[in-house]
Curated annotation (Swiss-Prot):
<dbReference type="GO" id="GO:0016887">
    <property type="term" value="F:ATP hydrolysis activity"/>
</dbReference>
<dbReference type="InterPro" id="IPR003593">
    <property type="entry name" value="AAA+_ATPase"/>
</dbReference>
<comment type="subunit">
    <text>Homohexamer. Interacts with ViaA.</text>
</comment>
<dbReference type="InterPro" id="IPR022547">
    <property type="entry name" value="ATPase_RavA_C"/>
</dbReference>
<dbReference type="Pfam" id="PF12592">
    <property type="entry name" value="ATPase_RavA_C"/>
</dbReference>
<keyword id="KW-0067">ATP-binding</keyword>
<comment type="similarity">
    <text>Belongs to the RavA family.</text>
</comment>
<feature type="binding site">
    <location>
        <position position="51"/>
    </location>
    <ligand>
        <name>ADP</name>
    </ligand>
</feature>
<feature type="binding site">
    <location>
        <position position="52"/>
    </location>
    <ligand>
        <name>ADP</name>
    </ligand>
</feature>
<protein>
    <recommendedName>
        <fullName>Regulatory ATPase RavA</fullName>
        <ecNumber>3.6.1.-</ecNumber>
    </recommendedName>
</protein>
<dbReference type="InterPro" id="IPR023671">
    <property type="entry name" value="ATPase_RavA"/>
</dbReference>
<dbReference type="GO" id="GO:0005737">
    <property type="term" value="C:cytoplasm"/>
</dbReference>
<dbReference type="InterPro" id="IPR041538">
    <property type="entry name" value="RavA-like_AAA_lid"/>
</dbReference>
<keyword id="KW-0547">Nucleotide-binding</keyword>
<dbReference type="Pfam" id="PF17868">
    <property type="entry name" value="AAA_lid_8"/>
</dbReference>
<feature type="binding site">
    <location>
        <position position="54"/>
    </location>
    <ligand>
        <name>ADP</name>
    </ligand>
</feature>
<feature type="binding site">
    <location>
        <position position="49"/>
    </location>
    <ligand>
        <name>ADP</name>
    </ligand>
</feature>
Length: 498
């Protein structure tokens, strides 16, 4: 076997060659290529004239010796037009019911069937056997067929509860295509002079029969790690709970796993990774409603669980809660405690500063930062005389935020423990303490837990960075996963700075 990374590079270059001259069809080409490399079937849904047949024709050039067959179904199509005419000679001379299959579906590696749902029962039944068993019954003989890729297309979905559902279930990959949307791509398409039937693939990139057969065995050796299986099972359980979720057969799940193995194999990996599960968005939907639902559920899985994002946030929440508990425990020990005076008959309780507080200007630290007057405040400077007057007579109190600028009006109070508490506009409070009486930085317990959490985050981010080099996954999905991981990292770093 070639070096895994060399194989991944070759498949990437092969796909780029197949995509030449096709606009906004990269994802479709790549998934059709993946289907061909793993022996699966594809259903293309979309209006006429959007290059569905051209995609199938292009895939023939991925292989050195591939033969292609394409056919437009009508309600009057006969098995002879798809599987080959009867041999009059064999019937006349030997009484054998035998088809001449040369040039027809039974001898083609790449098959494209347009308007597939218009096919009659005789064609559909034979097609089911061809897809399931890769066999074709030709008279008394059962012949093995070489089909590597079946691309079926239509501008509509099969009717529910119809005889077509069995065939539809065999279409593992389902792609919903539309017209070219981007202005520049539309212009390039209009002015392109490329002959669509030319072979765009260099011979050095084309796949030989021997390589294809060897790869089929090696794909099956790709492992499914426990944590990836747990993600798949989580998705399955979540879909089962949703009332509008599509029915996904065990057969479809089984075939989808092989597709994930192929994605890992042709990405140079020896095991399925969480990023491969994004492919399920093109395997599990049934109609427009379920397409959106499946994408939403897989998005939640990828941005919340696949790289332990939600688990790390849960751990962070527990650490922050523990830090708050420790801060609360420390507040009584470190906070500035004022002295309650007598004055039972006075309208207002009076206080005074401790006798050991003698400086003319007092700098008091906030146990936790608050946003006051549009500023993140960590300490406040008071004139001692002003603070003593406020403690004695009440009224307005002002202080310099972070010791700078003009003194600002503050919402200050004395709590039941005789501590000074400053509050912001949302009435969130922070106890004030003298310098040196508040613990420096984070408690060692919290610091260690945050360091361990950050280490785990770095490992998960490194795993994603390594796994995201996957040809078959759209970049916008990778971007959302990266953003989810960066958000977790930012919250961890913010907690470390408190």
């Amino acid at each position: 076997m070639a070096h895994p990374h060399l194989l991944a590079e070759r498949i990437s270059r092969l796909s780029s060659s197949l995509e030449k001259g096709l606009y906004e069809r990269s994802h479709a080409i790549r998934l059709c290529l993946l289907a061909a490399l793993s022996g699966e079937s594809v259903f293309l849904l979309g209006p006429p004239g959007i290059a569905k047949s051209l995609i199938a024709r292009r895939l023939k050039f991925a292989f050195q010796n591939a033969r292609a067959f394409e056919y437009l179904m009508t309600r009057f199509s006969t098995p002879e037009e798809v599987f080959g005419p009867l041999s009059i000679q064999a019937l006349k001379d030997e009484g054998r019911y035998e088809r001449l299959t040369s040039g027809y579906l039974p001898e083609a590696e790449i098959v494209f069937l347009d308007e597939i749902w218009k096919a009659g029962p005789a064609i559909l039944n034979t097609l089911l056997t061809a897809i399931n068993e890769r066999q074709f019954r030709n008279g008394a003989l059962v012949e093995k067929i070489p089909m590597r890729l079946l691309v079926a297309a239509s501008n509509e979905l099969p009717e529910a509860d119809s005889s077509l559902e069995a065939l539809y279930d065999r279409m593992l990959i389902r792609l919903w295509l539309d017209k070219v949307q981007d202005k520049a791509n539309f212009r390039s398409m209009l002015t392109s002079q490329q002959d669509e039937n030319d072979n765009p693939v260099p011979a050095s990139l084309q796949i030989t029969d021997e390589e294809y057969e060897r790869w089929q065995k090696e794909i099956g050796e790709i492992t499914l790690p426990d944590h990836v299986f747990e993600l798949i099972f989580m998705l399955r359980q979540q879909l089962d709970k949703l009332p509008d979720a599509p029915y996904v057969s065990d057969r479809r799940w089984k075939k989808a796993i092989r597709l994930l193995q192929a994605s890992a194999f042709f990405s140079g990996r020896s095991a399925v990774a969480p990023v491969d599960l994004i492919l399920l968005k093109d395997c599990l939907w049934y109609d427009a409603q379920s397409l959106n639902l499946i994408q939403q559920q897989i998005d939640v899985l990828m941005t919340g669980h696949a790289w332990q994002q939600q688990g790390m946030l849960t751990r962070l929440g527990a650490i922050v809660q523990r830090h708050l508990q420790l801060q609360q425990q420390q507040s009584d020990k470190t906070a500035l405690t004022v002295i309650r005076l007598g004055g039972i008959f006075s309208r207002r309780q009076q206080y005074q500063l401790p006798v050991n507080v003698t400086a003319s200007t007092l700098t008091l630290l906030l146990q936790k930062p608050l946003k006051l007057h549009d500023m993140e405040v960590v300490h406040i400077s008071f004139e001692r005389s002003a603070l003593e007057q406020w403690l004695s007579k009440g009224g307005e109190i002002r202080g310099k935020l972070n010791g700078i600028g003009f003194a600002q009006k503050l919402n200050l109070e004395v709590d039941s423990a005789q501590h000074l508490v400053v509050r912001d506009v949302s009435l969130q409070g922070s106890t004030l303490a003298l310098p040196g009486s508040s613990a420096e930085g984070l408690p060692s317990e919290i610091k260690q837990q945050l360091e361990e959490l950050e280490s785990d985050w770095r490992k998960q981010h490194a795993l994603f960075s390594e796994q995201q080099k996957c040809l078959f996954i759209p970049g916008d999905w990778l971007g959302r996963i990266e953003a989810s991981l960066q958000d977790v990292g930012a919250q961890i770093r913010q907690a470390q700075q408190c």
